[in-house]
Amino acid sequence: MTPLILALLVTMQSTDIEREAAGGVLRQIDSLEVRIRPTELAERLAGRSDPARDRVLARVAAVWSGEMQSLSDWIGHHPEVGWHEFQAVDTLTAVLRAYGFQVDTGVAGMPTAFVARWTSPAGANGPTLGLIAEYDALRGTQGDFHGDQHNAQSPIVLAAARALTEYMAQARVAGRVVVYGTPAEEVDPPAKALLWKAGVFRGADILVRSHSSTETRRDRPGFGVCCLDIDAVKYTFTGRPAHQLTAWNGRNALEAAVQFYSAVDHLRSTWRPDARVQGVIPEGGIAPNVVPDHTVVDYFIRFPDEVYLEHIARMMDDAAKGAAEMTGTEVSVTRYGEYRDGVTVASLEELFFAYAKKLGAPGLADEKGRPAGYEETGPVSRDVPGVGITVRSSSFANHTYGMRDDTFAEIGHHAFLIDAQIEAAVLFDFLTHPELRTAVAQEHHTLAGLQGQYLNALRRVYGPEIGADTALSKESRADLTIPKVQRP
């Protein structure tokens, strides 16, 4: 069995039942590596002598040190949480317009989303290179902060985009460069899924994005997402208020919430051990002398595959309805976030890693990570091949103040420069080497098609365990509503 198949065998995802379901899929992928040989292709492209590419990388370094490093620091010192990133968007789009991009803001009804397009003077009859930019901050006990280094991701993209457009214009290479400004990576609903549903990514031939990390690591090919498949669900119980001394005149929504929360705990023993179900009661009533008539229970439901995840979600819906029935209250269910597996393409992962080694990226990890579908962009990566580039930019874990501080230090600045150069190198090769475009398209098309077969196989294998839920709907049940935000 080839290395690619062995890699897929241990990572599609991690449970015995998934490996059983994946068996037939793995056999079909076996011939894919023989045709493409992604590691060999990547090493050949990265190792070749190419003065034009090297000039592009030198230009990335000049743009980063001259403009983008200070922009990264500025965004870092002015953190804005998801859906509120107005200063960052104003600044980034002004720079892109100065670089010759045509910029649309408020895309797909999101005030802080934008798309910036540049077309080569040689024409648009070439590849469309997409770069995903993020800029939202985290909420923290000490105030909003860039503990995931999103402040650097957009300047990284802009440095790569600037160097590529200059090369394409000077060398008369046809094609387009598109920068997608995507807000709110850290909060629900998932903005990239909403942008995908609105058709914003339509027309892109490749997408690249970067993300901070404590190591430089490529992912294994296959199907997956960084943090398991997730349903973010709110259960709202509505009752009737009354004085607590005559509580029988009311309908206690808090009692319903507690009964539901307790029922979920009892259900855990009936679920596979890979399930991760975490919840809070953010709204539990106002005063102890009033029967609560409104409560909210907020859950993240996680599982390695979406088939069993939906089974868990349906059981929880039934438990919520039961709690409402017991207490004489009503319950409404809102799925405000949905994260699903994407497709990870070895041709791009290996190319990114080959350039990481060539450029001296710190913290190289030989062991590959699990398939991530360039993180929370799962549905996007099923349609458009892409790669998430991670270069070690901190010695502290993600979502920490230590990682925020490293954003402004040499460890961060150096990593961000290498990240920008890798993005530019991967896109340069995709632009100038039809062999790479063919390999990426073939691999992505095959994996995207096999993902459907894999999910159907999971339904068959799970059948006796989840019963009628084997015939799950392919349509999203999520209510992904854009929050209403006013510009300050």
Spell out what each predicted region is:
Residues 1-7:
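Sec-dependent signal peptide recognition
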Residues 60, 64, 68, 72, ...:
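Sec/Tat-exported extracytoplasmic proteins
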Residues 130-132, 233-235, 388-394:
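Non-cysteine beta-strand/loop elements that form the S-adenosyl-L-methionine
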